[in-house]
């Protein structure tokens, strides 16, 4: 049985994304990273959404691997510093670091999370998500805001089962339906 300790997160390249995309849909929400007109294309997946800022403000995209060979890539996660203001977080631990957006507490935005199609329905998504949250918390980040484009009931229930809470729905970029859900430092 696979455990979260069997995996590690390493920086991801566009070649890694294409290697996974060539094996089929793998992401919640589903997207085709090879198409420029897809709402979540490669450019969005790598989340260069903070132009003219220091490199530290660009997203970090990770691959979850058991070994380093491309065929062993199981999941991807794309993370950016959050531009949202979450308001006052009164129980903020003293060791929390600032993300550079003058928020009441540090937070990140999870823009894409996915598991390769042939590894789905084996519990890998849950393990990968728990490992990702562990990594974020070890970096003294308190809040994670997750964006779901084209919300699917399966995706929403998956994240809620892992402790996420729905915050709000809205139209996001060109009237694309979206949902934001949060998971908080515990």
What are these regions (language model features)?
Residues 2-56, 61-66:
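Short amphipathic alpha-helix that is part of the acyltransferase structural core
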Residues 59-65, 76, 107, 112, ...:
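Short hydrophobic/aromatic beta-strand element in the GNAT-like acyltransferase core
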Residues 70-112, 120:
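Conserved acyl-donor/pantetheine-binding loop and adjacent beta-alpha core of acyl/acetyltransferases
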Residues 119-131:
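Conserved acetyl-CoA pyrophosphate-binding loop and the N-cap/start of the following alpha-helix
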Residues 129, 134-151:
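Conserved GNAT acetyl-CoA-binding A-motif
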Residues 143-154, 169-186:
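C-terminal "cap" of GNAT-fold acetyltransferases
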Residues 159-160:
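Conserved active-site tyrosine of GNAT-family acetyltransferases
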């Amino acid at each position: 049985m696979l455990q979260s300790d069997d995996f590690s997160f390493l920086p991801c390249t566009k070649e890694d994304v294409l290697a996974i995309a060539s094996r089929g849909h793998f992401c919640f929400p589903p997207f085709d990273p090879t198409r420029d007109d897809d709402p979540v294309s490669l450019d969005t997946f790598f989340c260069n959404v903070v132009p003219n800022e220091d490199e530290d403000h660009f997203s970090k995209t990770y691959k979850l691997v058991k070994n380093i060979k491309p065929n062993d890539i199981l999941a991807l996660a794309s993370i950016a510093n959050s531009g949202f203001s979450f308001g006052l977080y009164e129980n903020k631990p003293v060791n929390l670091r600032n993300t550079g957006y003058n928020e009441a507490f540090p937070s990140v935005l999870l823009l894409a999370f996915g598991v390769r199609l042939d590894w789905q329905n084996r519990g890998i998504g849950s393990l990968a998500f728990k490992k990702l949250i562990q990594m974020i918390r070890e970096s003294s980040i308190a809040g994670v805001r997750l964006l779901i484009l084209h919300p699917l009931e399966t995706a929403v229930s998956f994240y809620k089962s892992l402790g996420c809470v729905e915050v709000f729905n809205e139209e996001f970029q060109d009237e694309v339906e979206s949902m934001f859900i949060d998971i908080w430092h515990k």
